[in-house]
Amino acid sequence: MTRKAEAERNDEALLRAAREVLAVDGAHASVAAIAARAGVGIGSLYRRYRTKEELFQHLCVLALDDYLRAAEEGLADEDPWEGLAHYIRTAIEIGPGSLAPLAGLIEVTDEMADKNSRSDEAVTALVERAHRAGVLRADVTMVDLALLIEQLAKSPLLDQLGRQGRADLVESAREARARINAIALDGLRATAAHPLPGEPPSYELFSERWER
């Protein structure tokens, strides 16, 4: 294996480990725990990322790239509902809930802000298109969707089974999670019976926790 290939493999392992440790330990995830889970030395981590914050910032950039790609794929679907549903399902799998603990604890870089803005614009376009087509309930906003996705991306059952090493139950838990997601999606349809309580959440409610 060439040095370049080994470096790429180590980086992939570090990013995967960082996501996993972050999901369990939150923003207090230690560099040592991340390196150990990745099976590399701490020196390898610091050769790639000068600080833990830089590693977490890179994770956020990668996730924002994934959200933008999912939204653009949704917009490419001519069916307003299916396009929106594709974005929601894909965003849930990306797992924004695991990055939420970083809010307010790391500096938002210009790259993060730019990618977030582009992603927000694409998702807003999905929501507006679905509203115009009459397939998305009129009282659902882009912020509602962002908060819903963050909640659905968390799976305490899957996390617990993973910690217990219950590989025999993981697939059933994934199927159960897919059912819950489908129930939530149906609740977004314009045919939903009951109005939502309270006022729509502001964009600041969702975004200001990232300010330091």
Where in the sequence are the language-model features?
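Amphipathic alpha-helical packing segments from all-alpha helical-bundle domains
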Residues: 86, 107-158, 169-178
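Amphipathic alpha-helical segments enriched in hydrophobic/aromatic and basic residues
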Residues: 22, 30-31, 42, 52, ...
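C-terminal peripheral helix-coil segments that are non-catalytic and often amphipathic
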Residues: 117, 121, 125-133, 161-212
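Helix-turn-helix/winged-helix DNA-binding modules
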Residues: 26-27, 47, 137
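Short hydrophobic/aromatic patch on the recognition helix
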Residues: 39-49
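Basic, helix-initiating cap at the start of DNA-binding domains
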Residues: 1-37, 54
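Short linear capping/connector segments at secondary-structure termini
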Residues: 101-110, 199-202
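Hydrophobic alpha-helical connector segments
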Residues: 58, 65-97, 107-122
